[in-house]
């Protein structure tokens, strides 16, 4: 077999970088505390850096920083229409420099902006993607290029916005199952977190009946479901051609089937089990996006138990059976950390400080 010799290839050296852009965030993670109606927002602050390399100077014609909110529909009604495929909204613009000459070194521009608490959190699934990012655009000229504007340098810095519930005590859900005397009390945390664990406690009473017939538990099942509702409306130009098709999807994130593990004390059933959310694959936290790209993600905990009626008569201790089902809304959000919003961390301003105490004489 003849050998193949590799021929040398001519390579064109790349032009050395004349300048670089960089963004350093100084604020903590962007987390909305509370519902969109009550949240005070999230404060973002950082520094934009411009480093000039291998040039005696550069002439900056424009340096602009924008905060952008972008919605992308992965399966739009009209695939070739950009308006049906999403939207782009500029939330804030900073004009940092214009017609200015800079020598070699690093220049800094601080920036800050308060995200309103009514904005939806970042989300990404197989139907829609909502993202926030910073985009810096630099248009400059170099001495060798006659200080005419060259190809703009663009830096895209993604931001992750999350929403968390304010820490609160556990919630007790009470359900009555007529015509029986059975009553269930389910104690759950106020919110669940992805990749974590939570304790669920169940207490049931009313197993002893007045007619001498008792109820007996055979099986207990619980599952955590994710409900998603999505509807994409076409743009104004295609609204009469295509009708929106709402999509509803349910999937089970975690489940457990128990045939033992509970105990009876004085005709009361006690069950304590753990809801493990660490095995959830790409869970979506609760989020709601308004029209025209409507998305609502919620989570529900379903608790089911099968009870049999047994008669206190010799030779016949099995009777009819019932399935008792409890469905409660169980929020799934990002952990709140210390649960302190940005406005509570700020020191008091001069107007909010009261008068000094009287001096001693």
UniProtKB/Swiss-Prot annotation:
Point out residues bearing the modification Phosphothreonine.
12
| Subcellular localization | Cytoplasm; Nucleus
Q: What is its main location?
A: cytoplasm
**Record's GO cellular component terms:** clathrin-coated vesicle; cytoplasm; cytosol; nucleus
Which Gene3D superfamilies does UniProt cross-reference here?
2.60.40.640
Q: Which UniProt keywords apply?
A: Cytoplasm, Nucleus, Phosphoprotein
| Record-level GO BP terms | clathrin-dependent endocytosis; ubiquitin-dependent endocytosis
Q: Which InterPro entries match?
A: Arrestin-like_C (IPR014752), LDB19_N (IPR024391)
A GO MF annotation of the entry reads: ubiquitin protein ligase binding
Its name, as the record gives it, is: Uncharacterized protein C18H10.20c
Top-level taxonomy: Eukaryota, Fungi, Dikarya, Ascomycota, Taphrinomycotina
